[in-house]
Every structure is written in structure tokens, then in C-alpha cells.
UniProtKB/Swiss-Prot annotation:
It holds the Pfam family GPR15L. One of its GO terms (biological process) is negative regulation of cell cycle G1/S phase transition. Keywords: Antibiotic, Antimicrobial, Chemotaxis, Cytokine, Disulfide bond, Secreted, Signal. Residues 1-24 form the signal peptide. Disulfide bonds join 37-60, 38-57. It is found in: Secreted. This is Protein GPR15LG. Highly abundant in the testis, colon, eye, and tongue. Detected in the epithelial layer of the colon, but not the small intestine. GO terms for cellular component: extracellular space. The lineage of its organism: Eukaryota, Metazoa, Chordata, Craniata, Vertebrata. It comes from Mus musculus. It comes from the Eukaryota.
Length: 78
């Protein structure tokens, strides 16, 4: 009888911990898509040893809009 009560109490405690630990958690961040940024200014034209023009390119990150923190199950504020 005592074991049954303790195991039920432990299950309730574990359930409450799982619910409250994920209450205000943000969603996992999505991976940022990288693309090449090439500058188009005329002074940035580099020449290789063969004489071909190249543009200095680097990897750029797309700026994602800032998302507000959403609490799951919360009612909208009016």
C-alpha cells in the first residue's frame, strides 16, 4: 500500500516537472542558410595570374526576423 502511494506521488511529481520545464521554452532554432555575397563595386575586381577577373565572395547569412517568445497554451492578450 505504501509502495503504491509513493510510486503514484513520484509519477505526479515527474509529470509536473515535465509540464513546467517546457512551459516557456523557445522553439529550436532553424539552421541558417548560407549563400555567397559578392561585392559588385568596380574596385573590387581582382585578377588572377591568367588575367581573369574574379569577385571577392564570402559566405553570408540571411537575416531572420526576430520572433517573439510564444508560451504554449497561453491565451492572446487583448
Amino acid at each position: 500500500m505504501r509502495l503504491l502511494a509513493l510510486s503514484g506521488l513520484l509519477c505526479m511529481l515527474l509529470l509536473c516537472f515535465c509540464i513546467f520545464s517546457s512551459e516557456g521554452r523557445r522553439h529550436p532554432a532553424k539552421s541558417l542558410k548560407l549563400r555567397r555575397c559578392c561585392h559588385l563595386s568596380p574596385r573590387s575586381k581582382l585578377t588572377t595570374w591568367k588575367g581573369n577577373h574574379t569577385r571577392p565572395c564570402r559566405l553570408c547569412r540571411n537575416k531572420l526576423p526576430v520572433k517573439s517568445w510564444v508560451v504554449p497554451g497561453a491565451l492572446p492578450q487583448i
